[in-house]
Amino acid sequence: MKHVVIGTAGHVDHGKTALVRALTGVDTDRLAEEKRRGLTIELGFARLDFPDGSCAGVVDVPGHEKFIKTMLAGAGGIDLAMLVVAADEGFMPQTVEHLNILSLLGVRRGVVVLTKCDLADADWLAIARADLAARVKGTFLENAPVVETSAATGQGIEDLRETLHALVRQTREKSARVPFRLPIDRVFSVDGFGTVVTGTLIEGAMHVGGEAELLPSGTRSRVRNLQVHGENTAIAVAGQRVAVNLAGIKKTDVIRGDTLAEPDSVRVSRLLDVRLSCLRDSERTVENGSRVHFCHGTAARLAKVVLLDRDALAPGESAYAQLRFTEDVAAKCGDRFVIRFYSPLETIGGGIILDDAPARHKRNDAAVLSALAVQENGSGAERVLQALTALDTALPSAAQLAARLGMEETRLAPELDALLARGEAAAPLPGRFIASAVLDALWARCEALLTDYHAKNPLHAGIRAAELRQRLFRAVEPERADALLALFVHEGKLRFAAERYALADFTVRYTRRQTALRTELLALYRAADLRPERTDRVLACFDAKDRAETERVLESLLTGGELIALAPRLCLHREVYVCACALVRAYFADHETLTLAAFRDLLGTSRDSALLVLECLDRNDRTRREGDLRRPGRRLYE
């Protein structure tokens, strides 16, 4: 079933609440003060049922200028607008402001409702119709149906219901296959149940028992119960008005303007890159550095406007800007927003979010402006490639990319496939992606680093893997760093052996004297067999004048894996170590576990020597220790 939210808009006392009551039978004025004053102060909600069994949620917003902030909180999630204009008064200031807000928020469909038609004669109605047509010309309601009604007499109510039903059928259904997001417009407590939040589910689907994250705080909770239009449900989907009972959350932990979202699906930031537009009929110019009220979803925050390519934004103009906040904001690329002047409060413009967690930009930076142009107007592939490039070596998943771009994964998948096919992106790990340009830059740094290392350490077979990861990557998990380096190994650019990396064309070049020392050292360790020799004793066998040179060659043999370090200054010939591994493999063919005593007997050596070798096997994951026993390690059969 399709789920759509209809929102009222219009000047105070033009009959929005009475119209909703006539349509739905629900009085959305629930506060005593609203009853006493005869005007809507808070958001009201009702369910509108249609003959075919479908239904829509109706959000009734206040029309008084003092409550525009509340109106904005309700307007953020609507699909269809119901612009209400009283026939006896016509367009008024808040009618204009509400229409501007709907346009800025990206609402593209709706109906114009002329109310209180019983209070206007035929001549006045004709004037009202003409004025209405002129006022909506050039807006999204220019060709919208106009329905004349009277809540008092019932005139036009059925026509309006049929018109709304037709619009609902034509409205595109929102996807439930994306992470859910619910801007919170109301918070209260229910005895015996705890904290309940309400809002319009603008994306995805929520499930009872599912995990949810409160933003911008990042507090995690569990969905204890869900209600849609007062009825319990196991699942709620985008386009529905939802009440969510949250487990372990206090009422004081949540405020209107917070967002409830699928964990890790929405980023928080104090910077937003945007396309900012100033209303044509605004009397204000937005200066660089202006302080404004930023209205997004159900939230309102103070922001500083940094215009990126000019000093001022005049009425009717549009430009790229960065909004800077003093508190965290939870938003996504593609979201719409409204800005209101700081003092006096009036709507002056709005726009669309292009980057929801950017870096702090300098003004008049051509590269920044070019990147924003791609984000706004580029093809799907261009936007994906730009996002991958910006994410550097983070290796995002498709879901993370989709969330960053405000794009559904089903739309993202073919764009990613095309980039992979053209060689503009790569997948170092299954389901993890990187831009090829980032890989090229990474290789340039890696090559320069290793070239320098080889020059300074000509007798070392390579740099330790851990050291290379530390020097080459920042805040990248070892598994992902190794996957990127493995790409270079696969491409024949790097060589990896004995936990060390080297340039593929690098070889250790010994002098004649060093070659002789190497031969002698290897012969000594080979003769020692399973009796690990201390390096100081080995070095004592050589002429004192060759001591420094011998130490360098010894270090080279260790880095090259020709000698295996069992402990500080205790080494074993690699052939002996390989032989020990083979004996262990053969032993495990007939036994489940290995003891130190059995290993000693297997090698035919002393207990101390056997223990040193066995601990080395543990470190290299050839064996796995469980108390006093050993079992086959992950790398035993490599």
Residue locations for each model-derived region?
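Conserved Switch II/interswitch segment of TRAFAC-class P-loop GTPases
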Residues: C55, V61-K66, G76-I127
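Conserved catalytic-core segments of large NTP-driven translation/proteostasis enzymes
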Residues: C117, A134-S282
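Conserved nucleotide-binding/hydrolysis micro-motifs of P-loop NTPases
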Residues: H64-E65, D88-M92, V107, K116-D121, ...
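Conserved catalytic network of the ASCE P-loop NTPase/AAA+ motor domain
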Residues: V12, L39-I41, R47-D52, A73-G77, ...
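Residue-level signature of catalytic and energy-coupling elements of molecular machines
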Residues: D13, L19, G38, D60, ...
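C-terminal effector modules of nucleic-acid-centric enzymes and ribosome-associated factors
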Residues: A120-W124, D131-A134, I249-A565, H573-R622, ...
